[in-house]
Amino acid sequence: MKRLLTLFVVLSVGLTAVGTALGATLDDLERQLQAIQKQIQELKEEKQRQDQKIREMEAAQAAQKEEVKKEAASLREQARRVSSELAERVRIGGYGSVRFEGNSLKEQSNTFTFRRFVLTADAKPADPMQVYMELEFERFTQLELERTTRPQDGGLRVAQAIEGTDGSEISFEQLWFQYDLYPWLKFRTGQVLVPLGRFNINHDDNRWNIARRSLVDRGVPVLPVKSAWPELGAGFLGDIRLGELGKLTYEAYVINGVALDAEVENIAQTRDPRRDKLELEVEFQPSRGTAKLDMKDSKAVATRLAWSPYPGQEIAGSFYYGRYTPQFLSDESIVAFAIDGLTTIGPFEIEAEYVNTHFRNVDRVARSFARVVVDQSANIPSSVSPTFEAEVEFELAGLARNKHGYWIEGRYRFWPEFLTSTVFGKYFENPQLIAIVRGEQVWLNGLVREAEFEGGVLTKLEQENRRLYRVTAGLAYRPTPLVVFQLAYEYTKTDKGRSLAEVTNFLPAQSDEDEAHAILVGVAFGF
C-alpha cells in the first residue's frame, strides 16, 4: 500500500512536470508561430510595396517614353517647319555657260572657253524684305597663293608665288537688300546693277541665244565700263499700274560710280639682241566704283524708266551722270544715256538698245594726269646696266570723247512637229528652235590712242575716230526656258587697214587684221 502510494506520488509529480513542460513548449511554439506569421505579413507588405514601386517605375518609364516620343515628334515637326520655312525663305540657284570658238585671226586658236558660272541666293528675312546675291566665277578654275618668310644669308627672305588661270575673275555681280514699302516704292541698297540700257539688268547668259555678249555692253564697250556693271549705292524702284495703258517700271539710285583706276601689269621679257626687260605698266582706265573708300567726293546718279503697254512689249529710257576722275585729278564727269525696247508679234521678237557715253574734257584730264604723274616712264639706262632693263610706265586707256552704238536683234521662234517624238522634244513641255540675227555698230569719237608727257607736261595727245560693226546669225535650241544650245556665225569689221585689237577687248588681232570670222557653239544653263 505504501509502495502504491509512493508510486502514485511519483507519477503525479512527473505528470505535473511533463504537463508544465508541455505547456511551456506550446506557448513557445505559439509565440514562434505568431512571429513567423508576423514576418510573413511583413514580407507580404514589403512585396506589395515593392510591387507598387515597380508599377510606379513602369508607369513613370512609360510616361517618360511617351514624353520622349512627343518631344521627338515635336522636334521633327519643328525641323520640318524650319526646313520648309528655310526652303521658302532661301532659294539657291545660278547659271553658267561654255563656248567653243573657231576664229580666223592668226593669233587666236580654236578654243573652248568657260565663260562663267554664277551662284545666286535669294532670301526673304520677312515678307516685305529680300536679300539677293550673285557671285560670279568668270573663266575661273584655280587660284593659289604661296608665301614664305624666313631669315637667310644674314638677312630676311620673303617669297610669294601666285598661281591662277588667264583671265580669271571672282566678282559680286549683285548683292543687295530690298524693303518693299509698296509695289510702287521699294528701297534697295548694296551692290546694285546700274540701270543703263536693258542688257546690264538682264545679262544672264542663259537668257540670250548667242554665245557672245554685245559690243555695246561688253566687247568695246560703249557703256562706261563693261557689263555686268554693279555699283555700291542706294535708291528706289517700283511698278506703277496704269490700268489699260499697262505699267511703268522705274529704278533710281545714288552710287559711288565709275572712276579712273589703276591696273598694274608686270611684264618679264627676254630680247635678242636688245637687253632683257622687266616692265611695270600702270594703266589708268574707267573702272567700276570701289566698295571701300571712294576716290572722289561726288556721287553718281543712275535711273531708268520703262513703259510696258502689254506683256512682251517695252520701251525704256535711262540716264547716268557722275564724276569719273579721282580726287587728285581735275573734276570731270560722264554723261550717258540709253534707249532700249522689246516688241513681240506672234513668234517674232525684236529687241534693241542704243547707248551714248560722253567723257567730258578728256584732254584736260590728260594734262591733269601728266601734272600728277610727272614722267610717263623711267628706266635704267644701258650705260648702268648693259644686259638688263627695268622700266616703270604710266598711261591712260579706255578713254574717248564720245562712244555711241547700238545692237538690234531679231528672233523667230518655231518648232517642227516631226521633232516632237524625238529626244529633242518628247521629254519637254514646250521646246523651241529660235532663228536669230543680230546687227551691231559702234562709233568711237576722239579715242585716245596715245598720251605722252614728261616733267609734268603733256607733250602729245593723239586721238582718232574709229568705227566697228558686227553681224551675227545663228540658231538656238531651247528644250526648257532655262537651258539653251547655241550655234552662230559672227563677222566683225573695223576701219580698213586698222587692227580690231585697238577697238575691242576680246580679239587679239594683228596690226593689219581689220576683220574676223568666227563660229560660236555654246551651251548656257540655269537652275
Predicted regions and their residues:
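Surface-exposed loop/turn segments flanking beta-strands in extracellular/periplasmic regions
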Residues: 208-218, 271-280, 374-376
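Flexible glycine-rich, low-complexity coil/linker segments exposed to the extracellular/periplasmic environment
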Residues: 225, 245, 265-269, 276-281, ...
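N-terminal periplasmic/intermembrane-space "pro-region" immediately following the signal or transit peptide
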Residues: 22-103, 391, 420-423, 453, ...
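Loop-centered beta-sheet repeat module
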Residues: 269-326
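Bacterial N-terminal signal peptides
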Residues: 8-17
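Outer-membrane beta-barrel pore domains
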Residues: 103-107, 154, 161-165, 176-179, ...
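Outer membrane beta-barrel
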Residues: 79-260, 266-267, 297-302, 306-315, ...
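Bacterial N-terminal signal peptides that target proteins for export
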Residues: 1-8
